[in-house]
Amino acid sequence: MDASKSKALEAALSQIDRQFGKGTVMRLGDKGREKMPAISTGSLGLDVALGIGGLPKGRIVEIYGPESSGKTTLTLQVIAEAQRQGGTCAFVDAEHALDPVYAEKLGVNVDDLIISQPDNGEQALEVADMLVRSGAVDVLVVDSVAALTPKAEIEGDMGDHHVGLQARLMSQALRKITGNIKNANCLAIFINQIRMKIGVMFGNPETTTGGNALKFYSSVRLDIRRIGSVKEGDEVVGSDTRVKVVKNKVAPPFKQAEFQILYGQGINRLGEIVDFGVKLGLIDKAGAWYSYNGDKIGQGKANAMQYLRDNKEVAEFLEQKIKAELLGDIKPVAKEGAEVEEESAEQE
C-alpha cells in the first residue's frame, strides 16, 4: 500500500475509533489467535466430529431430527457438562414438556437451572434475548422452534391462515440476538423439528420449521437420528443414535458420530471410551476379552465398561488420552502421579 493510501486508512480508522469507540474496527492480526472455547456434548465421538471438542461458545447451534431421536437428551447433556464447569444455564421450554426428574438423571443440577415456559413465541425470544444480554448465562436452550407460536396465531381462531408469521418472527429475533450472543460468549442451542415438503419428487423432502433464517445464522447444525435399539436380552434399554454435522463454521463439516443413548442414563460415554480405546490401541481386544496395560479388564464390552465404571481414574485418563490423540491439543491428565507427555498431531 502506498503512503497516501496508508495515511488515508489510518485517518479513517482513528475517526471511527473516536466516533464509535476503541476496538470498533481493527486488523485481524492485532487480536491474538485463541482456540475456540467449547462445551462438551457429553459424547466423545461427537466432540471429535465437531473438531473443537464440543459446541462453540458465542455461537448459535441448531439441533434437529425426527420425534424421539434424542434432541432434548443431547441438549440436557450439554447443560450438565456446562454446569460441571461452573456455568449458568437457561432452558426456554416453549413445548412445556421438560421433565425435571429425567433431567436430574442425566446429571443436570435442576436447582440451578433457569427455566422459562413462555405463553407465545415473541415472549420466548424476548426472554431469551434478555437472558443473553445479562452476560451471566453460558448456555441457552430453546425447545423448540416449532413451538414458538406467534401471538397473532394464538389469539386468532382455529383455521385462520397466518402465512410466514413464524419465519418472520425467527428472522427478526435472530438479527437482534446474534450480536448479543457473541458479546456474551453464550452458547445458544435451538432445537428444531422436521416437516415434509409437499410435492417434492426428487431430492430430500425433509425441511425444518421456522423458515431459513436459523440455517444461515447457525454456526453448527446437527442432524440427529435413531438408527436402532440397544437390547439386554429381549428388553430395549436404549437407542443407537447417529449425529451428522451438516454445517460447521468452526471446523471441517460433514463428519458424523454414532453412540448409544441409554434410557434414564443418557449418552453411553464409557462405551465410547472402550470403542475409541480399542481403535487407538490404548485397550487391547483379543476375541471377547478386553485388556488394559496387560491386565484383563473384562470379557465382553459390558464387563469392560463395568471396570471403567469402578475405576474412574482409568476412565478419565483414557478419555483425555483419546482427546489428545484425536483433537491433538488437549493435554492428558497425569495418572498416578506420573507425567504424561502430550502427543501432538505430528507424532501420530
Swiss-Prot record:
Query: Per the record, what is one GO cellular component?
Result: cytosol
Which GO biological process annotations does it have? DNA recombination; DNA repair; SOS response
SMART domains per the UniProt record, alphabetical: AAA
What are the recorded GO MF terms, alphabetically? ATP binding; ATP hydrolysis activity; ATP-dependent DNA damage sensor activity; damaged DNA binding; single-stranded DNA binding
Question: Where, subcellularly, is it found?
Answer: Cytoplasm
List residues binding ATP: 65-72
* Membrane spanning stretches: none
Give the intrachain disulfide bonds: none
Sorted alphabetically, which keywords does the UniProt record give?
ATP-binding, Cytoplasm, DNA damage, DNA recombination, DNA repair, DNA-binding, Nucleotide-binding, SOS response
For this protein, the record's InterPro entries field holds: AAA+_ATPase, DNA_recomb/repair_RecA, DNA_recomb/repair_RecA_CS, P-loop_NTPase, RecA-like_C, RecA-like_N, RecA_ATP-bd, RecA_C_sf
Pfam families from the entry? RecA, RecA_C
* Classification via NCBIfam families: tigrfam_recA
Name the protein family. Answer: Belongs to the RecA family.
Entries under PANTHER family matching the protein? MITOCHONDRIAL DNA REPAIR PROTEIN RECA HOMOLOG-RELATED, RECA
**Role, per record:** Can catalyze the hydrolysis of ATP in the presence of single-stranded DNA, the ATP-dependent uptake of single-stranded DNA by duplex DNA, and the ATP-dependent hybridization of homologous single-stranded DNAs. It interacts with LexA causing its activation and leading to its autocatalytic cleavage.
Q: What's the name of the protein?
A: Protein RecA
Name the gene behind this protein: recA
